[in-house]
């Protein structure tokens, strides 16, 4: 198994078969096609959230970045570990999509609450010029 990227390996045969099947005939666009309707209903059922909006994206980077963009305003900060996936593997996509700033906390894989508090205070001390 190769875990270096979510789009590194070839597509499994069942995915190719599903794409070929989905390519038969015509479907409305912009998320109104029959496949998207099935996906939306399944996710709403699984999460017991009948009003949930569902958007499919092409990569994990897009999913992670868009999810982070819903959690903060463009002038805010996303605190993360220096070895976090969003820092090491997503390039600047989270900052691009959210407008927020990634701020590294500590120097290990787990964020220490004391280090986080110190980082928050450092950002707050910048006043209107900080996130």
Go through each PLM region and give its residues.
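Conserved N-terminal alpha-helix of the aminotransferase class I/II PLP-enzyme fold
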Residues: 12-60, 82-87, 93
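Conserved PLP-anchoring active-site segment centered on the Schiff-base-forming lysine
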Residues: 70-88, 117
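Short polar catalytic/cofactor-binding loops
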Residues: 7-11
């Amino acid at each position: 198994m190769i875990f270096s990227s979510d789009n590194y390996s070839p597509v499994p045969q069942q995915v190719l078969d599903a794409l070929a099947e989905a390519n038969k005939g015509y479907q409305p666009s912009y998320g109104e096609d029959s496949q998207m309707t099935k996906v939306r209903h399944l996710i709403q059922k699984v999460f017991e959230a009948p009003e949930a909006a569902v958007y499919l994206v092409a990569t994990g980077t897009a999913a992670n970045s868009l999810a982070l963009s819903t959690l903060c305003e463009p002038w805010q900060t996303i605190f993360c570990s220096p070895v976090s996936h969003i820092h090491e593997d997503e390039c600047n996509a989270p900052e691009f999509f959210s407008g927020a700033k990634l701020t590294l906390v500590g120097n290990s894989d787990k964020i220490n609450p004391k280090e986080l508090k110190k980082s928050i205070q450092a950002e707050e001390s910048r006043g209107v010029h900080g996130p």
